[in-house]
Amino acid sequence: MCATPVSPSPESPRSAQAGAAASDAAAQPVIVRWRGLEDYQASFDAMRAFTGSRSFETSDEIWLVEHPPVFTLGQAGDPAHLLAADSGIPLVKVDRGGQITYHGPGQVVGYLLLDLRRRKLMVRELVTRIEQAVIDTLAAYNLAGERKAGAPGIYVSPEQPNAGLHAGAKIAALGLKIRNGCSYHGVSLNVKMDLQPFLAINPCGYAGLETVDMATLGVAAGWDDVAQTLAASLIANIDGIPAAVGLPQAGAITA
């Protein structure tokens, strides 16, 4: 359980200790874990277990994952947005916000396991920072992304020189769950993937919404490169300071 410490009285010697612990915890660097290709259910179960067992001193983490083909439906999602139930792609009902989306090979998924109370960060502000991290990531590859009011995620800007018919297409989706002041789930960015499965759903509940990837817009970068850039952008936007993230090796990489 993600605990928020109870503040003792100013006279108590434990007050300074609690304050120091909170300060130390907030100052801890975000740990980036490269989990690679992983079944969605395994990631989902691991996120819930991590969030349920963390303490106030637990370091925040970002998990970088690539999933085999899967549709996920948010807790208030309408199953009617799955247009082709016979696609052969499994559907997993999850506890994040939002409607239905697709995850598959060639998509970078970043799961944000953050203690928002410790960071004094509101959910709306976290969403804004995640979206800005995606915009910054796209800009690193000379792509222009933009927000749309009332529709979380990032879309191809009409200002993108080679956008053509893809202007307004969705290139990144996000959805979060907050439990006891801690976040899990996160953001997905389409790098180079088979986009056909998106035709079997109303992406994020929007009928006829086009979904695009970076490769379609002329970007030749690989999954690892984009994942590294996205992780650094997420940390920079969440912590407000530049971050360097190493490429995957073994275990965890601390940024």
UniProtKB/Swiss-Prot annotation:
Its EC number is 2.3.1.181. InterPro entries: aa-tRNA-synth_II/BPL/LPL, BPL_LPL_catalytic, Octanoyltransferase, Octanoyltransferase_CS. GO terms for molecular function: lipoyl(octanoyl) transferase activity. It is found in: Cytoplasm. GO terms for cellular component: cytoplasm. It holds the Pfam family LplA-B_cat. Belongs to the LipB family. PANTHER family: LIPOYLTRANSFERASE 2, MITOCHONDRIAL-RELATED, OCTANOYLTRANSFERASE. Catalyzes the transfer of endogenously produced octanoic acid from octanoyl-acyl-carrier-protein onto the lipoyl domains of lipoate-dependent enzymes. Lipoyl-ACP can also act as a substrate although octanoyl-ACP is likely to be the physiological substrate. This is Octanoyltransferase. It comes from Paraburkholderia phymatum (strain DSM 17167 / CIP 108236 / LMG 21445 / STM815).
